[in-house]
């Protein structure tokens, strides 16, 4: 018999299993037979016809039907609804309205909806567009129109703001729980009950998490007043998001996140138990599933919850692990002798799951790639749940008539389950269920301020605004009932064939150009175990390196390399080249005169070797360069992408001729990726390469060079010359035999190299230089603070700010600067600074003492002038600099780039 651990292992191992394999398992174990499928389809057609004849779609459904995310106008309205209500100043409001309404083509939507209110709104939007659009010429009529625009702006501003509030009302039951409970009376009289959800997304500060917890606790108290039935299933309930209760709900913070979440959720669960209401844990992104199951087990194991049947879990059928999660939940409830609730939903943020998998380079998707597959999974999981009712109370959340018909057919005469729908949607369908089937119906209703609407609105539009969605098709009477009620088991094959052309597997993202680099998902235990186990043999290794040249260098003083996180912890040592050895290497260097096909094959093989040696590369990047786990993965992937990209470029340009000998002088901040990119580009073109890595990171460059040689690059075509810039760097840039220099580093050094080439090089010598600069972000009051702060943290402080692309200057609109900075402060306080070897670390050290002292001096000067707004503390050992925020008047206050975790903030009006 399978144990709880066995079921958990199945959840883990099926994270990205092949879609066909999962579907075969679901259909063979839980799928309806052919006769039942025919009955389901016939029943679904009847349901569609009854719903259409009963009444028209709701305003929400009509809006989604006309303005889904597949239209530019739908996107414009969504953006307007999300941003407008939090903008404090009239000028920005006017600019936002003009930006979103002005360019859109409202005319094509006039009269297209079956809702007179939606059509009237469309007329109003077209009139608004005609008023606010700028005239193309400057005649008298255009002057008059400009005057009308100026006079009309206050009216338009007021009207649009009111319209956006009304739009919010269609999606949100009430701005507070008392108002929501009052508005809920209408459907309570029809026999429905509610599950309330407090609007808002993931907390990014501890203060935000505390506010969400208080809001949930207060909501339970309010709901308790109307929870009058002895049967918990008849009472309203509450849905909560774990990401709202802890600011770092992610695998890297598992040791803290799970127990703290369990404590908070446990407290809310006990309050819900006392109120005799249900408490549902909402499902979130696929990468958080493992954490949520850990937390659920911890909370349910509390003996104080024994006898309470109201603990609920949401399971997303579009996830490939859904069926195995149900098995695990059933096993857990059985082991603990509990009854729980499970809300089965199709799933949210499908687009994000697909895109994330492609970007991360993982083997496959965590979700199904077609609507048919998701619908099949939903029906099979529903069948599975209906066989678990001794321990699980199923809650089927759907607006789809076919899914409803399937559940009713599978259930037969049983009524030990309920249906659920979203507020403002599926009303007619669920009203028919209440009337004809006598089953329970619950409404999932968001509660909160309209300014919190964005993420919820996006989900609703993504799920229900697509052309293929049931809600959209139901509102469109030109789509036949038979088409809407199509059997997904029948359409699966056609959908899969269409999907293969639309949705590219992560590995094939850049095909036919090149293979995508392999990724490691550190939220997945299988990938995490591989990362840790492959890196482990190199945790204490001492690397030794010397110049890799045609003429071997066997003597010279060894230079020790230390871990920037631990000043006295040696990583290895390197024998540096001197000026004469550099000149000798130039004498022995030769262009790589192999055919293009051979060069291309060798570079591709090198990419494969990089990936095969990922354990050593990860270890060396962490220990020599101070890279965190996420940064080591990103760097390896970038290096592999460079190799494959330039291999393909060589194939595209077979007639191009090499320049000759190229010096590649690379930096320490991307000691593998930029080193590899420079070298690969030069080699792909057939040049001979003399590579000088940064003084601080010669060991990773030596490993890369050895792998390139192992792949087949001849030694005369690639030589490595670690050494000082003043000697080796000068020799490699100031010799007439050098035909070009690739350099990444400071502007001052680039200028020195330029002078060297001008004085000693050939007239046509090439200099490709990537140098410093100051990157800025401008955030006005339309920017969503949570999203903006998250991006600021990533851009300014990831990699300890040691990126050429790092954010250096943030311009904030003065009206919103204070709350923005308060949120930024809170988000910074949630960061972990320390040993980059550990997954929990967000920010590692800067590269060396020189960098540490320069950055610290800049921060100290700002502090002395009263301009240091915040700075985090750091460990005592190592070259750590606490992320800092400094007030400036503008970009002109900075004389140079401060290459570290320092963000400068200016305000504007």
Where are these regions (language model features)?
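ALDH superfamily catalytic-core signature
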Residues: 707-712, 734-735, 740, 748-891, ...
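Generic beta-strand/beta-sheet core signal
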Residues: 197-199, 240-243, 278-284, 314-316, ...
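Structural signal for hydrophobic packing residues in well-ordered secondary-structure cores
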Residues: 51, 81-88, 188, 220, ...
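Rossmann-like NAD(P) dinucleotide-binding subdomain of oxidoreductase/dehydrogenase enzymes
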Residues: 622, 648-789
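Long, K/E/R/D-enriched contiguous segments that form extended
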Residues: 204, 270-275, 286-300, 307-313, ...
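Positively charged, amphipathic and often flexible ligand-engagement surfaces
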Residues: 1-517
């Amino acid at each position: 018999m399978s144990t709880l651990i066995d079921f958990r292992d199945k959840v883990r191992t099926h994270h990205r299993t092949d879609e066909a394999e999962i579907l075969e398992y679901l259909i063979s174990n839980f799928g309806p037979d052919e006769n039942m499928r025919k009955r389901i389809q016939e029943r679904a057609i009847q349901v569609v016809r009854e719903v259409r004849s009963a009444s028209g779609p709701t305003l929400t459904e009509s809006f989604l039907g006309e303005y889904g995310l597949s239209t530019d106008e739908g996107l414009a309205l969504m953006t307007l609804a999300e941003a407008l209500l939090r903008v404090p100043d009239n000028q920005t409001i006017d600019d936002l309205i003009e930006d979103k309404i002005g360019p859109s083509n409202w005319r094509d939507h006039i009269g297209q909806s079956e809702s007179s209110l939606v059509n009237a709104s469309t007329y109003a939007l077209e009139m608004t567009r005609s008023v606010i659009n700028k005239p193309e010429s400057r005649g008298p009529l255009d002057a008059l129109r400009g005057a009308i625009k100026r006079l009309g702006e206050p009216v338009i501003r007021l009207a649009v703001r009111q319209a956006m509030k009304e739009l919010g009302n269609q999606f949100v039951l009430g701005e507070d729980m008392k108002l929501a409970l009052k508005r809920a009376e209408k459907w309570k009289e029809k026999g429905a009950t509610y599950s309330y959800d407090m609007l808002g997304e993931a907390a990014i500060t501890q203060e935000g998490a505390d506010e969400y917890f208080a809001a949930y606790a207060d909501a339970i108290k309010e709901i308790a007043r109307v929870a009058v039935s002895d049967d918990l299933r008849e009472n309203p309930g509450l849905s909560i998001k774990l990401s709202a209760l802890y600011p770092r709900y992610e695998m890297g913070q598992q040791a803290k996140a799970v127990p703290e979440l369990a404590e908070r959720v446990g407290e809310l669960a006990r309050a819900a138990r006392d109120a005799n209401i249900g408490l549902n844990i909402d499902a979130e992104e696929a990468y958080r599933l493992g954490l949520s199951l850990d937390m659920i087990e911890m909370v349910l194991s509390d003996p104080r919850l024994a006898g309470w049947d109201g603990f609920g879990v949401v399971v997303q059928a579009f996830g490939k692990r859904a069926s195995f999660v149900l098995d695990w939940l059933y096993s857990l409830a059985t082991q603990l002798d509990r009854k729980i609730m499970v809300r089965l939903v199709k799933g949210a943020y499908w687009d994000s799951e697909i895109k994330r998998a492609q970007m991360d380079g993982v083997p496959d998707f965590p979700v199904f790639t077609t609507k048919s597959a998701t619908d099949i999974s939903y029906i099979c999981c529903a069948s599975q749940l209906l066989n678990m009712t001794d321990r699980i109370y199923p809650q089927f959340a759907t607006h789809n008539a076919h899914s409803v018909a399937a559940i009713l057919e599978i259930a037969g005469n049983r009524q030990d389950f309920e249906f659920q729908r979203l507020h403002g949607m599926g009303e007619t369908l669920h009203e028919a269920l209440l009337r004809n089937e006598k089953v329970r119906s619950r409404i999932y209703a968001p509660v909160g301020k309209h300014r919190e609407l964005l993420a919820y609105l996006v989900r609703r539009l993504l799920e229900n605004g697509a052309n293929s969605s049931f809600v959209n098709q139901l509102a469109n009477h030109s789509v036949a009932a038979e088409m809407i009620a199509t059997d997904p088991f029948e359409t699966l094959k056609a959908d899969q064939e269409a999907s293969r052309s639309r949705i590219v597997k992560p590995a094939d993202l850049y095909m036919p150009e090149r293979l995508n680099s392999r990724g490691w998902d550190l939220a997945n235990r299988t990938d995490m175990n591989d990362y840790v186990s492959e890196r482990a043999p190199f945790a204490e290794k001492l690397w030794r390196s010397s110049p890799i040249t045609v003429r071997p260098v066997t003597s010279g003083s060894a230079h020790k390399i230390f871990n920037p996180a631990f000043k006295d912890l040696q990583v290895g040592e390197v024998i540096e080249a001197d000026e004469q050895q550099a000149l000798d290497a130039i004498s022995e260097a030769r262009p790589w005169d192999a055919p293009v096909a051979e060069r291309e094959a060798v570079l591709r093989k090198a990419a494969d070797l990089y990936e095969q040696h990922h354990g050593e590369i990860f270890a060396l990047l962490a220990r020599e360069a101070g890279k965190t786990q996420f940064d080591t993965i990103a760097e390896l992937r970038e290096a592999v992408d460079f190799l494959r990209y330039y291999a393909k470029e060589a194939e595209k340009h077979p007639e191009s001729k090499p320049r000759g000998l190229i010096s590649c002088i690379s930096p320490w901040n991307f000691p593998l990726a930029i080193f590899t990119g420079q070298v690969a580009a030069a080699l792909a073109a057939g040049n001979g390469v003399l590579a000088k890595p940064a003084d601080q990171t010669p060991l990773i460059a030596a490993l890369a060079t050895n792998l390139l040689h192992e792949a087949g690059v001849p030694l005369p075509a690639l030589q490595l010359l670690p050494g000082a810039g003043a000697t080796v760097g000068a020799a490699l840039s100031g010799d007439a035999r050098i035909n070009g220099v690739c350099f990444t580093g400071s502007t001052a050094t680039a200028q020195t190299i330029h002078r060297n080439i001008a004085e000693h090089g050939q007239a046509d010598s090439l200099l490709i230089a990537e140098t410093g600069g100051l990157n800025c972000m401008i955030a006005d009051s339309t920017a969503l603070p949570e999203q903006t702060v998250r991006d600021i943290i990533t851009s300014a402080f990831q990699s300890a700010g040691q990126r050429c692309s790092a954010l250096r200057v943030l311009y904030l609109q003065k009206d919103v600067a204070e709350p923005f900075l308060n949120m930024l402060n809170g988000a910074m306080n949630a960061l972990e600074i320390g040993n980059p070897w550990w997954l929990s670390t967000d920010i590692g050290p800067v590269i060396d003492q020189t960098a540490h002292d320069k950055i610290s001096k800049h921060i100290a000067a700002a502090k002395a002038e009263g301009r240091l707004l915040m700075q985090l503390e750091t460990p005592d050992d190592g070259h750590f600099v606490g992320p800092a925020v400094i007030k400036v008047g503008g970009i002109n206050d900075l004389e140079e780039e401060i290459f570290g975790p320092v963000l400068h903030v200016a305000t504007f009006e």
